[in-house]
Amino acid sequence: RGSXLTTHPLRNIKDLVYMGXITIG
């Protein structure tokens, strides 16, 4: 999943935010 960060940074960030929202909510 490391190379995905360089290939699709926006997608990775969106996934991170999504997971964060699930953890908080």
UniProtKB/Swiss-Prot annotation:
GO biological process: proteolysis
Tissue note: Placenta.
PTM remark: Glycosylated.
Keywords from the named record: Aspartyl protease, Glycoprotein, Hydrolase, Protease
Enzyme nomenclature, EC number: 3.4.23.-
Sample GO molecular function, one term: aspartic-type endopeptidase activity
Family: Belongs to the peptidase A1 family.
Designated name of the protein: Pregnancy-associated glycoprotein 67
